[in-house]
Amino acid sequence: MGPVLRRRGGAPYWRWIQSIGSFISEQDPDQLSSAMGPGASHIAELIPGLREKLPDLTDSPALEPEPARFRLFDSVNTFLKNASQSQPLIIVLDDLHWDDHASLLLLEFLARGMAASNLLLAGTYCDVEVSRQHPLSQTLGSLMREQLFRRIQLGGLTQQEVSEFAELSAGVALPDNALDLVHRRTEGNPLFVNEIVRLLSQGEVATDPGWAATVPEGIRDAIGRRLNRLSSECNRVLTTAAVVGRQFNLDLLEELSSDFSEDQLLELLDEALKAGVLEEVRMGAERFQFQHALIQETLVSEISAARQVRLHARIGVALEELYGAEVETHAAELAHHFAEAEPVLGTEKLVRYSLAAGEQALAAYAWEEALFVFDRALAAKEGQPVDDDSAALLFGLGRSQAAMLDNQTRIEAYSNMKSAFDFYVDAGNVEQAVAIACSNTFPAWH
């Protein structure tokens, strides 16, 4: 299933939407209907494109938040288990440490339901990115207590493996002293080994007795040297792309790089592709991604906060133009960029897309993500007079909190929803006041 977007840059369940949506697009409608059964209408809440395959689906009846999420998860679990009966399925989840909370909850649910199925889940994550407070720690802890997964700790390459890697990947035969240094300096980390071998193969590291002093001390140093070999124009384009995210579309980059012609931009992308900095996501899809997340992070870290803010502003405006009438379906992505651009653009667009993204997250039972989105927008409006937007954000935040199982959070839900209710009453907006009073989260705070 490949890499996912950075957590706050994409919609909840993004990796599942991509992977299950891709699988669904390749299936016959009759097969889908059979594998999904009555759960098809529930899965359509997660994968809207399913209704194009199965146009006769009805809407799911409304439920309280927790039963509704269980119904969705159970429907996905049943579908994948049934689909794996005709042919075994392996789902590979890369970079789990970037997943949103809702995606990890779905992963945990599926892991519990895999018994007696032909479904295998395999995931990778960077352990140094996962603190005790990280959502993935909670997921792994729960699965470990129930003995539902096997952890395979990946150690570094041995000296012999480093030698073989250098020869196979770059045709470099490392002498013993060089091999020993490279192995010690990298601790066998394949990414770091790859970067140093690249430098060796390009003559970056001299063969004289002092060559060892030029070997990079860290992976970011090695990545920096690879970027230094690219033209300044290529680095400028890559920096813009890095602020977009790990993946980016060619049409967006064209909008953001108007000082280059199309041919010039393609030549610069070819330069980055040949250097192994970028790779095409799919041939012909005009979508690219950085070969490793650390390359993207290195580029972003090298520019000032002020420049990042202005790039996010340009990206948000360009995305609005590119998405056109479908802009609301990409609300989470736009909310992310306009949140980063708030110091120069203000809160208007941040609030607009946060309201849409929050409602979409609530509709997908991703309450944790909805809570984050609403809260972020409210924080940006702090100090401003309460208005319709603030009340709508408070209502959304309250519904997100009311869906949580934590009592303290539900108490906060009451306070936020009451604040929204009082504003609408004072403003004479009876319709919105009634909507709050009649919402299915009303019993949680009344």
PLM features: residue spans?
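A short hydrophobic beta-strand->loop->alpha-helix junction that borders the nucleotide-binding pocket
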Residues: M1-G9, Y125-C126, L154-G155
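Conserved Walker-type P-loop NTP-binding/catalytic site
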Residues: Y13-I90, L140-L148, L157-E167, E204, ...
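Structural signature of alpha-solenoid helical repeat junctions
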Residues: E326-E333, G346-K349, E369, D387-G396, ...
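Short secondary-structure boundary elements
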Residues: Q18, G155-L157, E161-F372, R376-K381
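Tandem amphipathic alpha-helical repeat scaffolds
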Residues: Y125, T298, H336, A356-A363, ...
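Sensor-1/coupling segment of RecA-like P-loop NTPase cores
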Residues: L106-Q153
